[in-house]
Amino acid sequence: MILYPAIDLKDGQAVRLVHGDMDRTTVFNDDPAAQARSFVAAGCTWLHLVDLNGAFAGEPVNAAPVEAILKACPVPAQLGGGIRDMATIERWLNKGLARVILGTVAVENPDLVREAARAFPDQVAVGIDARNGFVATKGWAEETDVQATDLAKSFEDAGVAAIIYTDILRDGAMGGPNTQATADLARAVSIPVIASGGVSSLDDLLALRDSGVISGAISGRALYDGAIDLAQALEALKT
């Protein structure tokens, strides 16, 4: 199982939110590229980036820090937030991003996801953010009547590289991930599923791994708070 350290970008800084609330922000580093370098130095093989302002604006806002991270770090990175058209997808991939994450547009324009996945094999992931099993969009500000599992199944034959499943009520709360719901989703589709939201300890990571069906896990606040030692966790996940 791959561990993805998360760098959430707001106003050019690396931050964490609680439950996706932009008013409940903690700034962890005002130099996101330096934060990324520290994660790479600890041994991570991927980075997970989110343009929080972009998720609300519907277009990239934190392009400068993302580009700085891409230049500073030799490991692949995936990015979500404000990526809602083919031109933006192409621009990011041409700048060296390994994978784009499409969230809101997966609900509102699923044909774009399919088109992008055909054009860029292995470089397009679908971000499914759910509250009580139902998908939320536009930076989690709008709730839909779409069930997370139904949305995931709708992309079964689209060729997407991964599904990133975030349980909104767990995100940033350090209360543990929704391992059961994530594993259930992973069993429902053949697409690799990455867990996000609530990872608060090494035991949480090991439980996700031991499910046997979850391909990756994203962790943010637990790494910044020191609840998880990144190098130690990476080593533990090898066994």
From Swiss-Prot:
Q: Name one GO molecular function term.
A: 1-(5-phosphoribosyl)-5-[(5-phosphoribosylamino)methylideneamino]imidazole-4-carboxamide isomerase activity
Is Phosphoprotein among the key words of this record?
no
Q: Where in the cell is it found?
A: Cytoplasm
Q: Catalytic activity annotated for this protein? A: 1-(5-phospho-beta-D-ribosyl)-5-[(5-phospho-beta-D-ribosylamino)methylideneamino]imidazole-4-carboxamide = 5-[(5-phospho-1-deoxy-D-ribulos-1-ylimino)methylamino]-1-(5-phospho-beta-D-ribosyl)imidazole-4-carboxamide
Cellular component terms per the entry's GO annotation: cytoplasm
Q: Does the keyword Amino-acid biosynthesis apply?
A: yes
Which branch of life, at top level?
Bacteria
BP terms from Gene Ontology: L-histidine biosynthetic process; L-tryptophan biosynthetic process
Q: In which pathway does it act?
A: Amino-acid biosynthesis; L-histidine biosynthesis; L-histidine from 5-phospho-alpha-D-ribose 1-diphosphate: step 4/9
Q: What Pfam families would the database entry show?
A: His_biosynth
Q: Which UniProt keywords apply?
A: Amino-acid biosynthesis, Cytoplasm, Histidine biosynthesis, Isomerase
Q: What is its EC number?
A: 5.3.1.16
Name the catalytic site residues. 8, 129
Xref: HAMAP family? HisA
PANTHER family, per database record? 1-(5-PHOSPHORIBOSYL)-5-[(5-PHOSPHORIBOSYLAMINO)METHYLIDENEAMINO] IMIDAZOLE-4-CARBOXAMIDE ISOMERASE
Return the NCBIfam families for the record.
1-(5-phosphoribosyl)-5-[(5-phosphoribosylamino)methylideneamino]imidazole-4-carboxamide isomerase (TIGR00007), PRK13585.1 (NF010112)
Name by which UniProt lists this protein: 1-(5-phosphoribosyl)-5-[(5-phosphoribosylamino)methylideneamino] imidazole-4-carboxamide isomerase
State the species of origin: Roseobacter denitrificans (strain ATCC 33942 / OCh 114) (Erythrobacter sp. (strain OCh 114))
Q: What is the name of the gene encoding this protein?
A: hisA
